[in-house]
Design a protein with these regions (language model features):
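Single, function-defining residue in the core of a domain
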Residues: 6-172
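Short beta-strand scaffold segments in enzyme catalytic cores
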Residues: 1-2
Length: 172
């Protein structure tokens, strides 16, 4: 399996996921690619788009520490708090959404994040049988339309990654 980074629709870095040989997880590969992009290649970018499998606290907090914006759908079993500490954590799927929050997103704390670290969460209807809960560390982002556009870009990148992974597997 490949993990890829794209810049203007071109591949700029990839890693072959082979933990038996290198002992690295997919998260380790992504973090190493980010380190390379920021500190070695000095590639200018400001946003990281990720799939749910990469939306782990360690990686989201690392991206935030780089002063980069992230967008990632969270798994529906993630626990979040939208009460600012007044209530216990709830499953994302059980959150209640006002009409305003459906348009503008809502501020939540993800369980395991530092006490003062919040994200903006958007409820994105993907299809009649699928809803994504997309988190971003850009707390000023207040448009479901912008979030949906970002999600479409992420999906196009995902399609390219799937194609390239299939192609690489046929070459071996």
């Amino acid at each position: 399996m490949l993990t890829l980074k794209h810049y203007n629709a071109g591949v700029i870095d990839y890693r072959i996921f082979n933990p038996e040989n290198d002992g690295l997880s997919k998260i380790d590969h992504v973090k190493n690619m980010l380190i390379s992009l920021v500190y070695q290649r000095n590639l200018p970018f400001d946003t990281v788009l990720m799939d749910t499998w990469y939306a782990v606290n360690k990686l989201m907090l690392y991206i935030d520490s780089l002063d980069k914006t992230f967008y990632c759908p969270l798994k529906i079993n993630r626990l979040v708090d939208d009460s600012f500490g007044k209530e216990k954590y709830n499953n994302i799927k059980s959150l209640e959404w006002s009409n305003e929050e459906l348009e503008d997103g809502k501020i939540v704390k993800i369980k395991g994040f530092p006490a003062n670290k919040k994200v903006k969460l958007f409820r994105v209807i993907v299809s009649t049988d699928r809803t994504d809960y997309v988190a971003t560390n850009d707390l000023s982002q207040s448009s479901i339309d912008v979030t949906q556009k970002v999600c479409k870009i992420r999906w196009k990148i995902e399609e390219l990654c799937l194609f390239e992974a299939r192609f690489a597997n046929t070459e071996n």
